[in-house]
Curated annotation (Swiss-Prot):
Keywords: Membrane, Transmembrane, Transmembrane helix. Belongs to the VAMP-associated protein (VAP) (TC 9.B.17) family. Its main location: membrane. Residues 133-152 are annotated as: Disordered. Targets proteins containing a FFAT motif to membranes. Involved in regulation of phospholipid metabolism. This is Vesicle-associated membrane protein-associated protein SCS22. It comes from Saccharomyces cerevisiae (strain ATCC 204508 / S288c). It is found in: Membrane. Present with 358 molecules/cell in log phase SD medium. The lineage of its organism: Eukaryota, Fungi, Dikarya, Ascomycota, Saccharomycotina. The keyword Cell wall biogenesis/degradation does not apply. The gene is SCS22. One of its GO terms (molecular function) is protein-membrane adaptor activity.
Length: 175
């Protein structure tokens, strides 16, 4: 299994949603099933997060960074290193005639039963941070901020929280 690229960079501004793609290429002779896991499931949505790739075929995986609250400091982002783990398993002979949908839903059992055949590959995530600008003397820093929601949170951080909760509820984010 090849993963292109081997690392992802989400570009600033980090308080906005952004999307990157990885390509999973099955360079083997057997079909494989894969699952994508993340160390930060509330910050990312992955589609598809589990799928089957035929021999010598590839799949593009969409990774959506949901954005961070404006209060997150740049140095805090530098210290956090989000990661993705791509878990792959060649489809066992006993499952060759099983329909794809059933195979995908049986992933937890496959993972437990064939744990010695599983291959793990990590993808590191990096966030590019814009250089800090010095405020000019004529502009009021308060006027440059997003409108307040009334409780100290900006509307954008509230919207990100709502999107994350909805994503969790409809099953966009898997562990």
């Amino acid at each position: 299994m090849r993963i292109v690229p081997e690392k992802l960079v989400f570009k600033a501004p980090l308080n906005k949603q952004s999307t990157e793609y990885i390509k999973l290429e099955n360079d083997g002779e057997k079909r494989v099933i894969f699952k994508v896991r993340t160390s930060a499931p509330t910050k990312y949505c992955v589609r598809p997060n589990v799928a089957i790739i035929g021999a010598h075929e590839s799949v593009n995986v969409q990774i959506v960074f949901l954005g961070l609250p404006k209060s997150t400091a740049d140095d805090e982002m530098d210290q956090k290193r989000d990661k993705f783990l791509i878990v792959t398993l060649p489809i066992p002979a006993a499952y060759q005639n099983v329909e794809d949908g059933e195979l995908l839903s049986d992933w937890p059992n496959l993972e437990e039963q064939y744990k010695d055949d599983i291959v793990f590959k990590k993808i590191k995530i990096f966030h590019s941070v814009l250089p800090k600008r010095k405020p000019s003397g004529n502009h009021d820093a308060e006027s440059a901020r997003a409108p307040s929601a009334g409780n100290g949170q900006s509307l954008s951080s509230r919207a990100l929280l709502i999107i994350t909760v909805i994503a969790l509820l409809v099953g966009w984010i898997y562990y």
